[in-house]
Curated annotation (Swiss-Prot):
Positions of the UniProt region annotated as Interaction with TGFB1I1: 74-206
GO molecular function, one term: RNA polymerase II-specific DNA-binding transcription factor binding
GO BP field: anterograde axonal protein transport; cellular response to butyrate; cellular response to hydrogen peroxide; cellular response to interleukin-11; cellular response to vascular endothelial growth factor stimulus; chaperone-mediated protein folding; female pregnancy; intracellular signal transduction
PROSITE patterns: SHSP (PS01031)
Residue positions where Phosphoserine is found in the record: 13, 15, 27, 86-87, 90, 102, 180, 200
Locations listed in the record: Cytoplasm; Nucleus; Cytoplasm, Cytoskeleton, Spindle
UniProt-recorded name of the protein: Heat shock protein beta-1
Positions where N6-acetyllysine occurs in the chain: 127
Assembly information from the UniProt record: Homooligomer. Homodimer; becomes monomeric upon activation. Heterooligomer; with HSPB6. Associates with alpha- and beta-tubulin. Interacts with TGFB1I1. Interacts with CRYAB. Interacts with HSPB8. Interacts with HSPBAP1.
Residues passing through the membrane, by range: none
Residues bearing PTM Phosphothreonine: 178
Length: 206
């Protein structure tokens, strides 16, 4: 199968979603800014005090040895938290008729992104050279691959980039073959033609 590069369109305004303004974007999509600076210490302190079950918990030293231990453990905890939230988790959704992937690429310009399909796989690549920001010099690059569902036509894959920096790649799913309802066909019997019947008598009279 040949490789196909998928062009993406730039959305001037975010797509309308009901309840979009009721909750922040990070509740739907984890932070995927590759190489971002670590979180401020006050954030890590708040997370460590919250201790969400099943997500992140305060370090043992922070709970057993008092405030002094919290101060010492804070940088290590902040780095661990940053690794969790910058792991690049994407969001995949599949409905009855559509397959969709959303990826946060807000640190990349449109010309630094490439989306292509090859052998039933969507490959998303982002790369920008070293540049300077408020923290120093940094360069970023990533590659993500997603397997298309069976039967999806790779030529129908499309992508778009929202103003918030969310890249959406989607494709229509093939329609399921519906089985027709069972129909009973009646069998009819044809009667044999009678030899010497009325029709034959009329033809003989002529």
């Amino acid at each position: 199968m040949t490789e196909r590069r998928v062009p993406f369109s730039l959305l001037r305004s975010p797509s309308w979603e009901p309840f979009r303004d009721w909750y922040p974007a990070h509740s739907r999509l984890f932070d995927q800014a590759f190489g971002v600076p670590r979180f401020p210490d006050e954030w890590s302190q708040w997370f460590s005090s919250a201790g969400w079950p099943g997500y992140v918990r305060p370090l043992p030293a922070a709970t057993a040895e008092g405030p002094a231990a919290v101060t010492l453990a804070r940088p290590a905890f902040s780095r661990a938290l940053n690794r969790q939230l910058s792991s690049g988790v994407s969001e995949i959704r599949q409905t009855a008729d559509r397959w969709r992937v959303s990826l946060d690429v807000n640190h990349f310009a449109p010309e630094e992104l490439t989306v292509k399909t090859k052998e039933g796989v969507v490959e998303i690549t982002g790369k920008h050279e070293e540049r300077q920001d408020e923290h120093g010099y940094i360069s970023r690059c990533f590659t993500r691959k997603y397997t298309l569902p069976p039967g999806v036509d790779p030529t129908l894959v499309s992508s778009s980039l929202s103003p918030e920096g969310t890249l959406t790649v989607e494709a229509p799913l093939p329609k399921a073959v519906t089985q027709s309802a069972e129909i009973t066909i009646p069998v009819t019997f044809e009667a044999r033609a009678q030899i010497g019947g009325p029709e034959s008598e009329q033809s003989g009279a002529k």
